[in-house]
Each structure stands twice: as structure tokens, then as C-alpha cells.
């Protein structure tokens, strides 16, 4: 009898994972673009100040190629990666749309498959609505 197998189903014991899987509704990464760094900073400052984002990464110099109004366009934009919680996404998306100069801004949210639990806890705490 092999001590490393569960004899009921003959599967090896579960191995510990180096990074804990984040709960599906805890943390969201929201991707957007801004036309320039000043606009990106204004958006980031507002979202963090209003507790809609825990953190916003600003990445200048991104090249975007896309189709808009029947034409293929190429623009240099500033990338935004916004960290928020699933419970704050609707408010964040509405505010981002209001702050954004584009007619149809990119607002795409994804749930990470894995994240450092301490980071998830910190990020979610930053966007939690304060008790009144």
C-alpha cells in the first residue's frame, strides 16, 4: 500500500499551492486607455481619491491599432490598469465613462485566476465604502 495515495480513489494527496487562488468576486483588473498622460493622471487621481480604485498603473507610449467608424486607426495612447473589487465595478465604470474624453472608452474587467492573498485583501480594503 502506497502511503502517498488515498486508497478510496487512488488519487495523490493535494499539493499546497504557492499562490492562493483569489475568490472569483474579490478583485478585478480593469483595462482602459487615455489619449495622453495628463488625462490618465486625472482619471487615476479621481478614481483612487473616490475609493473606486485601489491602484491605477499608468503606462505611456502604448500603440493601439483599431477600427473606428470604418477606418483602421493607429494611435499612441496611455494604458491604464485599474484595480478594484467586483462590488465597486459598476460605480467605477460609470465614473470612468464620465471622466473619459472618448465617445466609447475601453472599460474591460477581468478576474485574475490567482493573486497574492495579502494584495487582494489590501486592494479590497482600499475600495470598501466607508461606514457613515
Can you say where each PLM-predicted feature lies in the sequence?
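Positively charged, small/polar-rich N-terminal and surface patches that mediate targeting and assembly
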Residues: 1-132
Amino acid at each position: 500500500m502506497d502511503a502517498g495515495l488515498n486508497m478510496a480513489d487512488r488519487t495523490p494527496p493535494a499539493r499546497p499551492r504557492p499562490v492562493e487562488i483569489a475568490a472569483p468576486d474579490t478583485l478585478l483588473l480593469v483595462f482602459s486607455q487615455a489619449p495622453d498622460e495628463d488625462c490618465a493622471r486625472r482619471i487615476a487621481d479621481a478614481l483612487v481619491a473616490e475609493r473606486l480604485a485601489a491602484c491605477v498603473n499608468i503606462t505611456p507610449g502604448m500603440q493601439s491599432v483599431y477600427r473606428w467608424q470604418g477606418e483602421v486607426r493607429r494611435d499612441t495612447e496611455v494604458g491604464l490598469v485599474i484595480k478594484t473589487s467586483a462590488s465597486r465595478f459598476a460605480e467605477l465604470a460609470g465614473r470612468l465613462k464620465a471622466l473619459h474624453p472618448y465617445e466609447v472608452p475601453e472599460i474591460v474587467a477581468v478576474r485574475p485566476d490567482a493573486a497574492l492573498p495579502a494584495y487582494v485583501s489590501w486592494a479590497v480594503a482600499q475600495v470598501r465604502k466607508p461606514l457613515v
